[in-house]
């Protein structure tokens, strides 16, 4: 019955910003999720790209706005403004590149500087299809996630491994249901605010 009530509510939008060093696979993860495809030709993201997708969960439907940021240093100054109003940050590293893993601490710090501690952060070790070239163990990823109090998953955008699971876990952590209920409460308060304004008039005048 509560699901039926949700149909009247506008589709909730959540902004997810993808962060990480250059060539860790941010764009590839988004492309795999959006189109279930993978492009072997590497093209660096210039500035910021934006894509949007509706996601159907068990108890609600939401719209994810995916912001793909460039990893290059020259675009770094653009990123804080995109982090500022995000609901979640996906911080990606390449399991075959230990430097990209070390840099995730800085990216997570940037997110918390702009958004405070209430933002959802997912640490993602990408490129598990290159396991023979692995420089960062899954245990190291899990340890860092625990230390920094963030979520963690390993993925392969190329093989499609855990990509849907990544987005499902982030979506499940979003404050969708609470926000929807708060919205309804706000609407109810708005209605109540109009009634008290009428009451003093009827009490002060004739009781019609």
UniProtKB/Swiss-Prot annotation:
GO molecular function, one term: GTP binding
Keyword Chaperone: no
Activity control summary: Regulated by guanine nucleotide exchange factors (GEFs) which promote the exchange of bound GDP for free GTP. Regulated by GTPase activating proteins (GAPs) which increase the GTP hydrolysis activity. Inhibited by GDP dissociation inhibitors (GDIs).
Cofactor field: Mg(2+)
Modified residues annotated as N-acetylserine in this record: 2
Residue ranges annotated as motif Switch 2: 69-88
The protein's name in its UniProt record: Ras-related protein Rab-6A
Organism the protein comes from: Gallus gallus
């Amino acid at each position: 019955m509560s699901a039926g009530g949700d149909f009247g509510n506008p589709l909730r939008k959540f902004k997810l910003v993808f962060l990480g060093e250059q060539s860790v696979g941010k764009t590839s993860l988004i492309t795999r999720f959006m189109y279930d495809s993978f492009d072997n030709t590497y093209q660096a993201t210039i500035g910021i790209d934006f894509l949007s997708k509706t996601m159907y969960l068990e108890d609600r439907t939401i719209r994810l706005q995916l912001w793909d940021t460039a990893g290059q240093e020259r675009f770094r100054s653009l990123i804080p403004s995109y982090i500022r109003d995000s609901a979640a940050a996906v911080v990606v590293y390449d399991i075959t590149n230990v430097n990209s893993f070390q840099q995730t601490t800085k990216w997570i710090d940037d997110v918390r500087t702009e958004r405070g501690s209430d933002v959802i952060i997912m640490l993602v070790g990408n490129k598990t299809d290159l396991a023979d070239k692995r420089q960062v163990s899954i245990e190291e990823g899990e340890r860092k996630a625990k230390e920094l109090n963030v979520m963690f998953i390993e993925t392969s955008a190329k093989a499609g491994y855990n990509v849907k699971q990544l987005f499902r876990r982030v979506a499940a952590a979003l404050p969708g249901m609470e926000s929807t209920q708060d919205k309804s409460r706000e609407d109810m308060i708005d209605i109540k605010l109009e009634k008290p304004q009428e009451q003093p008039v009827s009490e002060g005048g004739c009781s019609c």
